[in-house]
Curated annotation (Swiss-Prot):
Record's protein name: Fructose-1,6-bisphosphatase/inositol-1-monophosphatase
Cofactor requirements of the protein: Mg(2+)
Binding site for Mg(2+) 2: 86, 89, 214
Binding site for Mg(2+) 1: 70, 86, 88
Short name of any one Pfam family annotated for the protein: Inositol_P
UniProt keywords, alphabetically: Carbohydrate metabolism, Hydrolase, Magnesium, Metal-binding
InterPro entries cross-referenced by the UniProt entry: IMPase, Inositol_monoP_metal-BS, Inositol_monophosphatase-like, Inositol_monophosphatase_SuhB
Catalytic activity: beta-D-fructose 1,6-bisphosphate + H2O = beta-D-fructose 6-phosphate + phosphate; a myo-inositol phosphate + H2O = myo-inositol + phosphate
EC numbers for this chain: 3.1.3.11, 3.1.3.25
Enzyme class: hydrolase
PROSITE patterns: IMP_1
Function comment: Phosphatase with broad specificity; it can dephosphorylate fructose 1,6-bisphosphate, and both D and L isomers of inositol-1-phosphate (I-1-P).
Length: 264
């Protein structure tokens, strides 16, 4: 338990360190400083600097752990402890001046996510959770919304801008969910979406073709807040996620099964 608490404290420190970089540079990134690392996939010096700060913090405390970042890959290997970090979740939002973005720091032991910290710098909101210790935002305990009514439910979603699938699959799922629930929103940052479901702002979420650094931290927070989730795909590879309170999770999962191979 003491180790778990230490891992959590380091995750929070690391998320805040990365978030400070994002705060200092928000609204200042120029077009010439933005690189296209892949089709419709952008990165700037801010992402890289944030990742460096986060890695410095983690490796200072746990030099034998593996740290896997979105921008600069993995450092260390062979440890059962792996940190998955997204130094800037919501890059497109960030470079366009839209304040929904975050730093995501998650720890996995073996195959199990055990610690997560997600920091939203613009709103100064720090979410955190650890296995068996609950989920919090700025020190306040959070729980998923106790809502079983589809017509009153809010769902967040995300489609990949560069898909390996026929986009009609996602559009069909969206359509079927849209007709049944009260509202749907696309904030544009998966870690933020998971935290907002954990906090009870929304009831459910569906995101497709996610990487482990996108969701590891948020999954811990969601689960500790009483939420449930289903991952479809490769463990710690590319995966789809359906999450929420039990009622919304189960509904979205049944819709997804109509259009995708979901083995659960």
């Amino acid at each position: 338990m003491e180790n778990l608490k230490k891992y959590l404290e380091v995750a929070k420190i690391a998320a805040l360190a990365g978030g400070q970089v994002l705060k200092e540079n928000f609204g200042k990134v120029k077009k010439e400083n933005i690189e296209e690392k892949g089709e419709k996939d952008f990165v700037s010096y801010v992402d890289k600097t944030s990742e460096e700060r986060i890695k410095e913090v983690i490796l200072k405390f746990f030099p034998d752990h593996e740290v896997v970042g979105e921008e600069m890959g993995a450092e260390g290997s062979g440890s059962e402890y792996r940190w998955f970090i997204d130094p800037l979740d919501g890059t497109k939002n960030y470079i366009n001046g839209f304040p929904i973005f975050a730093v995501s720091v998650g720890l996995v032991k073996g195959e199990e996510p055990i610690v997560g910290a997600v920091y939203l710098p613009y709103f100064d909101k720090l979410y955190w959770g650890a296995k068996g210790l609950g989920a919090y935002v700025n020190g306040k305990r959070i729980k998923v919304k106790d809502n079983e009514s589809l017509k009153h439910a809010g769902v967040v979603y995300g489609f990949p801008s560069r898909s390996r699938r026929d986009i009609s699959i996602y559009l069909n799922i969206f359509k079927d969910v849209f007709y049944e629930v009260g509202s749907m929103r696309r904030p544009g940052a998966a870690a933020v979406d998971l935290c907002m479901v954990a906090e009870g702002i929304f009831d459910g979420m569906m995101e497709f073709e996610m990487k482990p650094w996108d969701i590891t931290a948020g999954l811990v927070i969601l689960k500790e807040a009483g939420g449930v989730y289903t991952l479809v795909g490769e463990p710690f590879g590319v995966s789809d996620i359906i999450a929420g309170n039990k009622a919304l999770h189960d509904f979205i999962l049944q819709v997804a099964k109509k259009y995708m191979e979901v083995a659960v």
